[in-house]
Amino acid sequence: MPEKLRIGSRSELPAEGEAREFEIGERVVCVARLHGEYSALDNVCPHRGGPLGQGVIEGDKLVCPWHGWQFDPKTGAVGHAPDQCISTYPLTIEDEDVFVEIA
């Protein structure tokens, strides 16, 4: 059963076209904002373990800062390697608090 965890406050969320890392215990989650919507996904690139929350948004893709792998921030799909999809997590905002649901 998924656990709803607070990752921060609304004021800490990334600006449009940016990504940011959030620590939840020993786990780090990437939150990206694209077209006014926030997406939460695994922070680790499956290629070499790059920190996706330190990446940039180019067009509609989140780009890993280490080797340029590109991810759809909503689905976690990798453009050139669909078998390397990363996990995404439901994100909700309640008043000023931001939560993700992690199984």
Each model region followed by its residue ranges:
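Glycine/small-residue-rich loop that forms an oxyanion/phosphate-binding "nest" at active or ligand-binding sites
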Residues: P82
